[in-house]
From Swiss-Prot:
Domain Protein kinase: 68-352
Mutant lacking the gene: phenotype: Increased length of spikelet awns and weight of seeds. Increased sensitivity to brassinolide. Enhanced tolerance to drought, salt, cold and heat stresses.
SMART domains xref list: S_TKc
InterPro entries xref list: GSK-3, Kinase-like_dom_sf, Prot_kinase_dom, Protein_kinase_ATP_BS, Ser/Thr_kinase_AS, STKc_GSK3
Record field: catalytic activity: L-seryl-[protein] + ATP = O-phospho-L-seryl-[protein] + ADP + H(+); L-threonyl-[protein] + ATP = O-phospho-L-threonyl-[protein] + ADP + H(+)
Record's GO cellular component terms: cytoplasm; nucleus; protein kinase complex
Name of the coding gene: GSK1
One Pfam family hit: Pkinase
GO MF entry, a single one: ATP binding
Name assigned to this protein: Shaggy-related protein kinase GSK1
One GO BP: brassinosteroid mediated signaling pathway
Residues annotated to bind ATP: 74-82, 97
Keywords: ATP-binding, Brassinosteroid signaling pathway, Kinase, Nucleotide-binding, Serine/threonine-protein kinase, Stress response, Transferase
Length: 407
């Protein structure tokens, strides 16, 4: 749950009326409460503090107080802080993202998270505002707690000098694409910071959830967006070229970088600066053609780039790498944004066929997490694509209404 690199200009919605903060809290059925500090932890500014809020009170529902005891910080950045907390009333562990809130504006992350509900997207439980003695206003987003990140899982294998087993690569990347297919089609959201640190992993079930929507935005065709977005190693080339009218295909590039990193055990494009990032990409994909440059940013077509030949994909990965893995990576990491496959197309790729086999299980014999409970993201999918996405055994199990099948 890390922040994007460096301070970024936030694209904010039009300022709401002055009472908007209180109204936002009221519409959420949540009243503002002052942050109550309880110095039980060490010198840490968070550990041991208790945050109380009132929920309910709508539709005849009784109001009740919920208190959270902050346990440890799990992420910090320019956005604020994320900490693990325990609900004192229920004992449930949650993650709370606490961000300084400008009273003049709505919080985009909150608006987007309220609109999303999917097994592979982090769930917003509720939110509330808190204030400090200096009258600073903070928004607290209370989310489900998932203990691991893909970054830490990969680091575990790297430290042991091992490659991540292919079954886990398939399972994690498939679920990442399922989450992207949902956010790209249903709420129409572009995440804009897909990276291993923002992919949560449950170590018991191996369910994956996309998190940190602090950089996310609904992209409107013809409306400019900032290009300084997305962490460097995962930044699509059109962003490096300064494009402002990009599409959700920037997330597809980032996911392709994550796939390659899981297969290699290290980042595919480890640039040390924005320019060096482009050099790293050119070393693998070769120099972009004039047409490819035009697709990324028409203003750069007259620039002279050193002519470098593409490095064959099969030479980038080790000899035993399945050709399906290499084929998928090559379909994701294309210079032309429109040539990258969609997230739903990626889910249907043959690299993931093992997950669709009737008796497929986790290495420990336990069942996979839900993989086929698609919802509205299939609304515009062709019958042929749906046929590739939903295995026969799932279709038989759930009858004809397979678009809503659970696994």
């Amino acid at each position: 749950m890390e922040a994007p690199p460096g301070p970024e200009p936030m694209e904010l919605d039009a300022p709401p009326p002055p009472a908007a903060v209180a109204a936002a809290a009221a519409t959420a059925g949540i009243s503002e409460k002052v942050l109550q500090k309880k110095e039980e932890g060490g010198g840490d500014a968070v550990t041991g503090h208790i945050i109380s809020t009132t929920i309910g009170g709508k539709n005849g529902e009784p109001k009740r107080t919920i208190s959270y005891m902050a346990e440890r910080v799990v992420g910090t950045g320019s956005f604020g802080i994320v900490f693990q907390a325990k609900c004192l009333e229920t004992g449930e562990t949650v993650a709370i993202k606490k961000v300084l809130q400008d009273r003049r504006y709505k919080n985009r992350e909150l608006q987007l998270m309220r609109a999303m509900e999917h097994p592979n997207v982090i769930c917003l439980k509720h939110c509330f505002f808190s204030t400090t003695s200096r009258d600073e206003l903070f928004l607290n987003l209370v989310m489900e707690y998932v203990p691991e990140t893909l970054y830490r899982v990969l680091k575990h294998y790297s430290n042991a000098n091992q490659r991540m087993p292919l079954i886990y690569v398939k399972l994690y990347i498939y679920q990442l694409f399922r989450g992207l297919a949902y956010i790209h089609t249903v709420p129409g959201v572009c995440h804009r910071d897909v990276k291993p640190q923002n992919v949560l992993v449950d170590p018991l079930t191996h369910q994956v959830k996309l998190c940190d929507f602090g950089s996310a935005k609904v992209l409107v065709p013809g409306e400019p967006n900032i290009s300084y977005i997305c962490s460097r190693y995962y930044r699509a080339p059109e962003l490096i070229f300064g494009a402002t009218e990009y599409t959700t295909s920037i997330d597809i590039w980032s996911a392709g970088c994550v796939l390659a990193e899981l297969l290699l055990g290290q980042p595919l494009f480890p640039g040390e600066s924005a320019v060096d990032q482009l050099v790293e990409i050119i070393k693998v994909l070769g120099t972009p053609t004039r047409e490819e440059i035009r697709c990324m940013n028409p203003n750069y077509t007259e620039f002279k780039f050193p002519q470098i030949k593409a490095h064959p994909w099969h030479k980038i990965f080790h000899k035993r790498m399945p050709p399906e893995a290499i084929d998928l990576a090559s379909r994701l990491l294309q210079y032309s944004p429109s040539l990258r496959c969609t997230a739903l197309d990626a889910c249907a790729h043959s690299f993931f066929d093992e997950l669709r086999e009737p008796n497929a299980r986790l290495p420990n014999g336990r069942p996979f997490p839900p993989l086929f409970n698609f919802k509205h993201e299939l609304a515009s999918a062709s019958p042929e694509l749906i046929h590739r996405l939903i295995p026969d055994h799932i279709r038989r199990q759930h009858g004809l209404n397979f678009a809503h099948a659970g696994s």
